[in-house]
């Protein structure tokens, strides 16, 4: 309900994005499905996607979510990378290789922040590049406890890690 209230109060937004979480899906699955209809970008992890749709075919899930109206759907799959759906395409990308995971807490939020930061600067034309940006940012988050690694991250470091990400 809060998300719908916020959306209704924003006048002429550039875009609306939602990043789901298990609690919402557990308590309000119908509301989450309605929320998808109101956003331009929908992000969630693979477990949340399967829980919400009741099956494990992630390509079909991406298409289901896209049919509700978002321009971009991104399913985060942790160490298996992510799945980006837009238009009639579904692209899978890797995570950044050879990252020592110290603490995965906040990786999904960092990923979403990286995606949205890219889109805020460059627009919606390249959702795969946006997801690569998010993947790179998240790689810094998981390689330390808390946010300590993010304080010193510069754009050139983010771009260096993007070069290591593969389209699968």
Question: Model-predicted segments: where are they?
Answer:
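Conserved post-catalytic alpha-helical subdomain immediately downstream of the catalytic base
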Residues: 98-163
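Glycine/charged-rich beta-loop-alpha catalytic/anionic-binding loops adjacent to active sites
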Residues: 89-100
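Ribokinase/PfkB-type carbohydrate-kinase core domain
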Residues: 1-41, 46-91, 123-125, 147, ...
């Amino acid at each position: 309900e809060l998300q719908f209230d916020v959306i209704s109060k924003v006048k002429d937004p550039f875009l609306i994005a939602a990043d789901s979480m298990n609690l919402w899906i557990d308590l309000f699955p119908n509301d989450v499905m309605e929320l998808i209809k109101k956003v331009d970008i929908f992000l969630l992890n693979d477990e949340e996607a399967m829980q919400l749709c009741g099956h494990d075919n992630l390509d079909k899930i991406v298409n289901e979510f896209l049919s509700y109206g978002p321009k971009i759907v991104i399913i985060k799959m942790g160490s298996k990378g992510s799945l980006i759906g837009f238009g009639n395409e579904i692209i899978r990308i890797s995570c950044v290789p050879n990252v020592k995971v110290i603490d995965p807490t906040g990786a999904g939020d960092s990923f979403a922040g990286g995606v949205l930061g890219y889109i805020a600067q460059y627009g919606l034309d390249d959702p795969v590049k946006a997801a690569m940006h998010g993947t790179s940012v998240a790689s810094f988050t998981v390689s330390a406890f808390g946010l300590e690694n993010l304080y010193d991250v510069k754009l050139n470091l983010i771009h260096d890690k993007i070069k290591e990400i593969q389209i699968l």
